[in-house]
């Protein structure tokens, strides 16, 4: 199309109809329990051609494997790019965060005998968790993508209800997590320096460095509110802004060298990781703000997945796209990255987390 080679990402009633459309989309994309850990089959051919306008630096694409940790992978990737764009180099461990979050939930479950152990969450949770438990770098603390965190969580749940003493439980829990995830050490060694995990986390993410945004009309714009989605387990508040303002925040950050963490719905048939493209098959005919609110209230837009926005691009027709780094490995035409249309982001965004420096 116009002789442009396909861009490669550098390494580094109406409601009834909508419900029917969503049901078909779910069946077609085989979306099941795993949520953000589910890889979908390609639903479109790879024929789109893109021109990259802005591409930020990134660490290598990771694979979250059998886990619901997309929120941790995406938020850590955002922090990694932030440092790379400043000339620093960090590659951060989602598995460290997973272990600490499992330990926290396991201790609570042992005492209360209530609840479950789960790794579902939202991007702001990552900031809270590393502020409490610290962080390690990827080379020192990671498991392979075959580790099934759903199985690990079930083992921990059974152990917590097994009639052990607290000391026995702590010892057995540590042994289980050492074996199934990775052994924790009290020091982080990085580029000749030695940190505690908390010191390392504070060097990576400063207090108030990021702000979370959303865009829904059941709360007033210009004010924060606690977003009513099941995975908002820490009851985080998100600044509510019009959707056009939210997209402008993304574009402005990317143009100034800051990545953005994106969270939203991926159950539309136009979202296809294996072809590396996400578009809306049916663009809303009315006001986007009203349409996205209607889909949210009817549970047609849900909190499915989290990824890192790292660039701006356009297709052969001049339509704008965001370049997004996923955490499902590199098995697609863009080596694990995707081109996601701005229209898709406008319609299907649940929230973003962006740098506060602008």
Task: Pin down the residues of each PLM region.
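N-terminal amphipathic/basic-hydrophobic helices that include classical n-h-c signal peptides
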Residues: 1-19
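Sec-dependent signal peptide recognition
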Residues: 21-26
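C-terminal motif of bacterial Sec signal peptides marking the signal peptidase cleavage site
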Residues: 34-35
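Short, low-complexity, disordered segments immediately C-terminal to signal peptides
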Residues: 39-47
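Active-site signature of cysteine proteases
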Residues: 39-40, 54, 59, 174-358
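Active-site nucleophile-adjacent alpha helix/oxyanion-hole segment immediately C-terminal to the catalytic cysteine
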Residues: 46-195, 208, 213-218, 251-256, ...
């Amino acid at each position: 199309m116009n002789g442009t080679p396909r861009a490669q990402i550098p390494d580094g009633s109406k409601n009834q109809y909508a419900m029917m459309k969503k049901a078909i989309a779910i069946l077609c994309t085989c979306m099941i329990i795993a949520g953000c850990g589910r890889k979908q089959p390609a639903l479109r051919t790879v024929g789109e051609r893109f021109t990259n306008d802005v591409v930020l630096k990134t660490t290598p694409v990771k694979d979250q494997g059998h886990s619901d940790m997309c929120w941790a992978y995406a938020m850590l990737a955002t922090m990694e790019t932030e440092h790379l764009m400043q000339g620093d180099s960090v590659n951060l461990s989602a598995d460290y965060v997973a272990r600490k979050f499992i330990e926290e939930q396991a201790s609570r479950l042992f005492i209360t005998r209530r609840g479950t152990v789960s790794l579902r969450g939202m991007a702001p949770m990552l900031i809270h968790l590393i502020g409490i438990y610290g962080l390690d770098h990827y080379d020192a603390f990671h498991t392979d993508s075959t580790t099934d965190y759903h199985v690990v969580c079930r083992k921990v749940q059974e152990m917590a209800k097994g009639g052990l003493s607290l000391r026995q439980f702590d010892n057995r829990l540590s042994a289980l997590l050492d074996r199934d995830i990775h052994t924790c050490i009290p020091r982080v060694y990085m580029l000749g320096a030695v940190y505690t995990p908390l010191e390392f986390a504070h060097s990576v993410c400063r207090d108030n460095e990021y702000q979370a945004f959303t865009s829904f009309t059941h709360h007033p714009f210009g004010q924060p509110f606690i977003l009513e989605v099941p995975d908002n387990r820490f009851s985080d508040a998100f600044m509510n802004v019009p959707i056009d303002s939210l997209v402008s925040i993304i574009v402005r950050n990317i143009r100034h060298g800051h990545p953005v963490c994106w969270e939203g719905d991926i159950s539309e048939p136009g979202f296809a990781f294996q072809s590396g493209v996400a578009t809306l098959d049916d663009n809303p005919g009315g006001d986007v703000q009203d349409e996205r609110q209607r889909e949210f209230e009817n549970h047609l837009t849900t909190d499915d997945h989290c990824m890192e926005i790292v660039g701006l691009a356009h297709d052969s027709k001049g339509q704008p796209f965001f370049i997004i780094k996923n955490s499902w490995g590199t098995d697609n035409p863009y080596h694990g990255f995707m081109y996601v249309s701005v229209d898709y982001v406008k319609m299907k965004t649940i929230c973003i987390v962006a740098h506060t420096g602008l």
